[in-house]
Every structure is written in C-alpha cells, then in structure tokens.
Amino acid sequence: MALEEIQRDADEWIRKHTPGYFTPLMMLARLTEELGELSRAVSHHHGEKKPKPGEEKGNIQDEIGDLLFVLVCLANDLGISMDDAWRGLLRKLYERDVDRWKS
C-alpha cells in the first residue's frame, strides 16, 4: 500500500468517525504516548525488563500501527505528503549520508 493511500484511508476514517483532527500539539502528545507503548512492548519482548506479573507483553505490530496512524494524521492535518517526506529522506540519505555508515 502506498503512503498516499494510507493517508487517504486515515483521512476518510477521521472524517467519518470523529469531529476532526486533533491539534498538532495534541497529536505530538499522542505520538509520544504511542511511542512509549511501542517502547514498552519492545522492551518486554526483547529487553532486560520483563512484564510485571499479570501484565501483557504488548503487540509490537499493533503498537507500530498505532504510531503510524497518529503520524499520518499529523501529516494530513499539516498538509504534508508522506510520499514527499519519504522521497526527501531518501535523497538526504543517498546524497549527504552515502558514506556515513560504511565500515
């Protein structure tokens, strides 16, 4: 699925099921919250800190999906094309950082 399609799907859902997008600062807070949930799930599955008794490990795939949804909503609200953002990142990696990670 292309990033443009993901953005369109998120926008359709927001328009049908909510009064609209949260403010950018609220979405940034939501991103932080979702990143924390992803961090906890990764830590529980792969880190030293295991879940407390009775606490679920969390589903890493689900947490990545939650994080992606909020990021896409932020991009939509700010009028940013995720495709353009991705192409810009790749250009930066291939031009500026092409030799940065070679051993």
Report the location of each language-model feature.
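Flexible "arm" and connector segments at domain edges
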Residues: 1-64, 68-103
